[in-house]
Amino acid sequence: MAIHLYKTSTSSTRNGAVQVKSNPRNNLISGQRRCGKGRNARGIITARHRGGGHKRLYRKIDFRRNEKDIYGKIVTIEYDPNRNAYICLIHYGDGEKRYILHPRGAIIGDTIVSGTEVPIKMGNALPLTDMPLGTAIHNIEITLGRGGQLARAAGAVAKLIAKEGKSATLKLPSGEVRLISKNCSATVGQVGNVGVNQKRLGRAGSKRWLGKRPVVRGVVMNPVDHPHGGGEGRAPIGRKSPTTPWGYPALGRRSRKRNKYSDNFIIRRRSK
């Protein structure tokens, strides 16, 4: 996959880049119907700032990495419209072809493998019990056999900091420190496309292609629309602390459900 840099001909293409991407494999894609785009069955907005967007094909990603002890080769590195990380197509020795998340630094032609006693190499997947302390990992399982569920976004990386008994201690990208079964698998390395949060879209239309609608500040609304609204001119919000459009405290209040079963596995809550 090549990266094409735009010339500075217009303000919307300044500092812009686009991926010259290949067509995905037909047996690894499926159509998807984006239900509602933020609306419920009656057409009422239930999730704000969503709607529109370009039509997408879903790429089937192998989060389980259950092709054990079979070496695979990275054939392509492709753009995926359903996530901010790149994906890469793997051709395994037994003829199987699958998509996985692109590890940072992996190039076309590299070989990867998953199993119990495989080298600690970028892109390889193995159980946490076989990894040394301090290993950088991503695509981490929470439940054995369910597939990776943690650290899957672009640039995400977790760290294995301890192993004791049947559990391993991980430091997640959010700063949370929690316990996971040592038998769960993870992939060595960091997810690629690290600088995605520094990408300049250049114009509002590029944001609309992603299915994101404009965000309006509550302080410029009317009182009927938002608790911050109303007043003459540039008036303050008129409250001790900011609130959501429905009057609940915002910016700092804990929103996690109390007494969840997973509280027993969290050693230190995430940092703000």
UniProtKB/Swiss-Prot annotation:
GO process terms (BP): mitochondrial translation
Keywords: Chloroplast, Methylation, Plastid, Ribonucleoprotein, Ribosomal protein
Coiled-coil residue spans: none
Polar residues biased stretches: 7-30
GO cellular component terms listed in the entry, alphabetical order: chloroplast; mitochondrial large ribosomal subunit
Ranges for region Disordered: 1-33, 220-272
GO molecular function, one term: structural constituent of ribosome
Protein's job: Component of the chloroplast ribosome (chloro-ribosome), a dedicated translation machinery responsible for the synthesis of chloroplast genome-encoded proteins, including proteins of the transcription and translation machinery and components of the photosynthetic apparatus.
Protein name stated in the entry: Large ribosomal subunit protein uL2cz/uL2cy
